[in-house]
């Protein structure tokens, strides 16, 4: 009898001819997450992925809870195809559940096993009742569902630890996220990673108006995001000169929207170089002046690449709740200004017209900044 973890996945099972691609990517990501555990083996057999580990199983579970594509993690016992061994595993798993109700459910893909599913369930239930006091059977609404699977080996398990869900990272291409250091953009990056998208990040740094601590905050956000499966390449773009050019030469009501358009143009150039197929932002409809539907239309027109906005229909409370869940919130609220919070006009345009914004942009020579920006690349 051996302690193992059964890995449950949801959407992957619906992927038809591509199912093996998604499963193999998930296995690769699990191995990466557990790469510093010496005594760990990850295997796939008959539509099941399981992890064998001789070390700290609780720490292994914590790592697996951050692997996209896993919907559930189950502590299980793997035994030989022997009823006595299955009984021992079932009794071991049910210890600590005294006073509760339970039900045994058996699946028997291995039809060569001499007992059918109903007979296995009946015999396992009887063994549990014989060895553990104060248990009752409830086939309709049990407190504990004890599962037995008869495959090339027997698997016995009860209860599921919730996983993070989504699709395995790396199954849906790459995108570049504009990471400001605020609450929203790291959540947006995380949501796209959950859909299988690898990310690189761009941060616009405006010294001396923004401090090194503001940049450090973004680096720390990337460190948190990297815990979900990949090292993140952060492009730190020096934005001061272009931002001052905008502030000095453009009408105040358009400075914010023009700044956003310049950021998009630079981010698109970086994205094209790194193989990204889209940009990601943390914009939420109507949250600020630059996030009205008119402003987003004008922003979109600055680039040809798709812009994904996974937070578009969320309110601030929902975004904060998710930021807290993924452990980025406390970093995001550190009191260091980023380039989006400096030079903010008193009355920004909320319904800008594209032709008027382009006319305002032409008052400055922005193309040289787009073509020859200075960047620092940090791999986190």
Curated annotation (Swiss-Prot):
Tell me yes or no: is tRNA-binding among this UniProt entry's keywords.
Answer: yes
Signal peptide extent: none
What the entry lists under Gene3D superfamilies is as follows: 3.30.2130.30, HUPs
Q: Which Pfam families match?
A: ThiI (PF02568), ThiI_fer (PF22025), THUMP (PF02926)
Pathway listed for it? Cofactor biosynthesis; thiamine diphosphate biosynthesis
- Which SMART domains does the record associate with it? THUMP (SM00981)
* Keywords, sorted A to Z: ATP-binding, Cytoplasm, Nucleotide-binding, RNA-binding, Thiamine biosynthesis, Transferase, tRNA-binding
Q: Which domain of life is it from?
A: Bacteria
Domain THUMP: start-end pairs: 58-162
Q: Which GO terms describe its cellular component?
A: cytosol
Instruction: List localization entries.
Output: Cytoplasm
**Any GO BP:** tRNA 4-thiouridine biosynthesis
Q: Which reaction equation describes what this protein catalyses?
A: [ThiI sulfur-carrier protein]-S-sulfanyl-L-cysteine + a uridine in tRNA + 2 reduced [2Fe-2S]-[ferredoxin] + ATP + H(+) = [ThiI sulfur-carrier protein]-L-cysteine + a 4-thiouridine in tRNA + 2 oxidized [2Fe-2S]-[ferredoxin] + AMP + diphosphate; [ThiS sulfur-carrier protein]-C-terminal Gly-Gly-AMP + S-sulfanyl-L-cysteinyl-[cysteine desulfurase] + AH2 = [ThiS sulfur-carrier protein]-C-terminal-Gly-aminoethanethioate + L-cysteinyl-[cysteine desulfurase] + A + AMP + 2 H(+)
Enzyme superclass (EC): transferase
Task: Output the Gene Ontology terms for molecular function.
Answer: ATP binding; CCA tRNA nucleotidyltransferase activity; tRNA binding; tRNA-uracil-4 sulfurtransferase activity
Residues holding ATP = 178-179, 203-204, 260, 282, 291
Q: What is its EC number?
A: 2.8.1.4
**Function summary:** Catalyzes the ATP-dependent transfer of a sulfur to tRNA to produce 4-thiouridine in position 8 of tRNAs, which functions as a near-UV photosensor. Also catalyzes the transfer of sulfur to the sulfur carrier protein ThiS, forming ThiS-thiocarboxylate. This is a step in the synthesis of thiazole, in the thiamine biosynthesis pathway. The sulfur is donated as persulfide by IscS.
Question: What protein family does this chain belong to?
Answer: Belongs to the ThiI family.
Identify the HAMAP family for this entry. Answer: ThiI (MF_00021)
Question: What NCBIfam families would the database entry show?
Answer: tRNA uracil 4-sulfurtransferase ThiI
The protein here is known as: Probable tRNA sulfurtransferase
| GN (gene name) | thiI
